[in-house]
Design a protein with these regions (language model features):
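Generic early N-terminus positional signal peaking at residue ~5-7
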Residues: 6-8, 23-24, 70
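Beta-hairpin "wing" of winged helix-turn-helix
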Residues: 70-79, 86-87
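Short, hydrophobic-biased segments on the C-terminal half of alpha helices
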Residues: 65-66
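Alpha-helical residues within the helix-turn-helix
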Residues: 52, 69-70
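Residues in soluble alpha-helical coiled-coils and helical-bundle/repeat scaffolds
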Residues: 41, 45, 74, 106-107
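N-terminal helix-turn-helix DNA-binding core of bacterial DNA-binding proteins
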Residues: 19-60, 83-92
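C-terminal regulatory/oligomerization modules of transcriptional regulators
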Residues: 1-16, 90-144
Length: 144
């Protein structure tokens, strides 16, 4: 039995949707990537801000950002010498359960809560991204 071109096209389209959803879920299957999404859901940030808040090195943060970007979960924007990352709202609006997980399930988790507390302390510290990179000022901010 043969499929019509239209039937084949519909199956192919549905398969692509499933593959894209799986790619999204795979990108969110690592603690640090969920931490990044959690932080970016509060504010657009650059790599140096993420690495200092999360306590990770630049290569780890960049690797995780790359995977999130490949899955189209985040967007990047270059501003002068800095690259800033922010949430891509489209997949979160398309798959509401992703936003529900972030909003409801993770808000009381100690790691994510700690990241948000660190972000808030950083934002109120008046330390700029340039100062984070050029000095150890971030180390002077009590984070715990």
């Amino acid at each position: 039995m043969y499929m019509s071109k239209n039937e084949y096209s519909n199956i192919k389209e549905r398969s692509l949707k499933i593959m894209n959803l799986l790619k999204t879920l795979k990108a969110l299957s690592h603690l640090n990537r969920i931490r990044i999404v959690n932080l970016l859901s509060h504010k657009e940030l650059c790599v140096c801000e993420l690495e200092n808040i999360m306590g990770l090195n630049q290569s780890n943060v960049s690797r995780h950002l790359g995977k999130l970007q490949e899955a189209d979960l985040i967007l990047r924007e270059k501003k002068a010498q800095w690259v800033y990352y922010k949430i891509n709202e489209k997949p979160f609006n398309k798959h509401k359960f992703l936003q529900n997980i972030l909003n409801e399930e993770l808000e009381d988790h100690v790691v994510y809560e700690g990241d948000v507390i660190k972000l808030q302390k950083y934002l109120t510290s008046e330390v700029s991204c340039e100062e984070l990179t050029d000095s150890n000022l971030f180390g002077n901010i009590k984070m715990n």
